[in-house]
Amino acid sequence: GGDGRHGRLHIDVGAAVIERIAGQEGDDDGRLAIAIIVEQIIELSRSMFPVRFMGFPAYTYFALKIMDEKGIHLKLKKGSKIMLGGGWKNHYSEKVDKETFYRLAERVLGIQDIDIIEFFGAVEHPILYCDCRYHHFHIPRYGRALIRDVDTLEPLSYGQVGLLNLLTPMVYATPILSVMTDDLAVLREGETCPCGNKSAYIEIVGRVGLHDIKTCAAGAENLIKEALK
């Protein structure tokens, strides 16, 4: 909905950015593409409309860091938001804490942490964990989470670090009601969060083995190449 010019603006800019990025050889981690996106952010900052960002935390952080290092500090229109999902993947060793990310976003774009929304989930576990006002991933009623000991796989109590095990009865197509992730996490009691949601929440603290981490797409690409040999 809204002003038709707004919709056309997004379509035109999106097509232009995709065309430019597709024509670049770039380095493997996509930082050349990020430089192109930074140009577009600067251009969009002159618009009368708010800007909405959707993407991986890692690449969003890299773009903000580039802008900060170059002294590019903008004040985007009210209503601008950042929506994050997908984790840090193979850039996990460069991950920064949330407070550092929020301060950088406010300094570079003028977007406060209340307008930064993050999602957590897994391809094999079709339940979306949306962060609350205090950026905690509360467990929805149609999902469950266990923290398991990394050696024995025994369930752990609140406050203990272990492997994150996600469960839901909402999967019908394949027998994957229980998914063991490679995320290290802590389960916190919901009452400790001031947002009012009493459901327990997940705090992601790391990943098991930072070497050879691949995205889902990269893993699928390798499997296809092997199958075609």
What are these model-predicted stretches?
Residues 2-229:
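Active-site glycine/GP-rich loop and adjacent strand/helix microenvironment
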